[in-house]
Swiss-Prot record:
This is Undecaprenyl-diphosphatase 4. It catalyses: di-trans,octa-cis-undecaprenyl diphosphate + H2O = di-trans,octa-cis-undecaprenyl phosphate + phosphate + H(+). It is found in: Cell membrane. The gene is uppP4. GO terms for molecular function: undecaprenyl-diphosphatase activity.
Length: 259
C-alpha cells in the first residue's frame, strides 16, 4: 500500500467514524476498491488511533475532568454505557470477525442503519442535557452501540438514534454519542493490536502508517465538530438516504456477482 491509499483510507475512517454511516463498512469497501486483503489490519489499528486522537483533542476538557474526578457521574455513565459492547464483543468476537471478512451481509446492514436513522428522525425533539442523562439512558444507548459490532451498522448512528429516543436534545445526543465512542475505539485498538502481535498483519511502510493516522485524526476532528453543529438544526434523513442507496448498490453488485 502506498501513502496515497493510506491517506484516502484515513479520510474514510475519520469522516465515517463520526458521521452516522459506518466507518467499518466504508473501510471494507475501501479495501475492496484498493484490492487490499485482511492485511491492512495494522493500518486499521493506526486509523482507529487517529480517530481516538480526534476525540481526545475535541473533548480535552472533559478528559481532564475525568482524570481529576475518576468517580464522577460522567465517568460512571461512560462505564455503564460501555458494558453492553464489552459483553457482546467478548462473547461473539470470532463470529463477527468472520462476518466482517466476507462482507456478505454488509448491504443489508447499511439498509438497517438507514431504517433506524429515518425512524429516529421522526421523534419529537427531547430536552435532556448532559446533566439529565440517567444510568438507564446510558445503558440503553450503550446497548444500541453494541449492535454496531456488525460491520456496516453505524456505531455513531445507533447511539445517536438511541439518545434521541431517550429524549436527549439533538446536540446532546451527538455530544454524548461521540464521548461514549472513546471506550469502544480503545477496545477495538486493543483487540486489533492483539491480532497484530499474533502475526495476522502485513508489513506496511511507516510513511503510510503516519499519513493514514494523521489523516484519520484530522478528518475525524472535522467530522465530530461538524456533526454536533449539524444535528442541532438538520435532519438525519440525508444519511438514511445515503446508506439506503449504498446498501441497494452493494446488494445489486453482489447479486450480479460484480462485487
Amino acid at each position: 500500500m502506498n501513502w496515497l491509499e493510506a491517506f484516502i483510507l484515513g479520510i474514510i475512517q475519520g469522516l465515517t467514524e463520526f458521521l452516522p454511516i459506518s466507518s467499518t463498512g466504508h473501510l471494507y469497501l475501501g479495501r475492496h476498491l484498493f484490492q487490499l486483503d485482511e492485511a491492512g489490519l495494522f493500518l486499521d489499528t493506526m486509523l482507529h488511533i487517529g480517530t481516538l486522537l480526534a476525540v481526545f483533542i475535541y473533548y480535552k476538557k472533559e478528559f481532564i475532568y475525568l482524570i481529576k474526578n475518576p468517580f464522577s457521574k460522567l465517568m460512571l455513565l461512560l462505564i455503564v454505557g460501555t458494558i453492553p459492547a464489552v459483553v457482546i464483543g467478548l462473547l461473539f468476537k470470532d463470529f463477527f470477525e468472520d462476518i466482517s471478512k466476507t462482507g456478505i451481509t454488509i448491504g443489508w446492514e447499511f439498509l438497517v442503519t438507514g431504517f433506524f436513522l429515518y425512524v429516529a428522525d421522526k421523534q419529537k425533539n427531547g430536552r435532556k442535557k448532559m446533566g439529565d442523562i440517567t444510568y438507564k439512558d446510558a445503558f440503553i444507548i450503550g446497548s444500541f452501540q453494541a449492535a454496531a459490532i456488525f460491520p456496516a451498522i453505524s456505531r455513531s448512528g445507533m447511539t445517536i438514534v438511541a439518545a434521541l429516543w431517550r429524549k436527549l436534545d439533538r446536540e446532546t445526543a451527538a455530544y454524548f454519542s461521540f464521548l461514549l465512542s472513546t471506550p469502544a475505539i480503545v477496545g477495538a485498538i486493543i483487540l486489533q493490536f492483539a491480532d497484530v502481535f499474533q502475526g495476522k498483519a502485513e508489513s506496511i511502510s511507516s510513511t503510510s502508517l503516519i499519513v493514514g493516522t494523521l489523516s484519520a485524526a484530522f478528518f475525524g476532528y472535522i467530522a465530530v465538530s461538524w456533526m454536533i453543529q449539524y444535528l442541532k438544526r438538520h435532519s438525519l434523513k440525508v444519511f438514511a438516504y445515503y446508506v439506503w442507496g449504498l446498501g441497494i448498490l452493494i446488494l445489486t453488485l453482489q447479486f450480479t456477482d460484480v462485487f
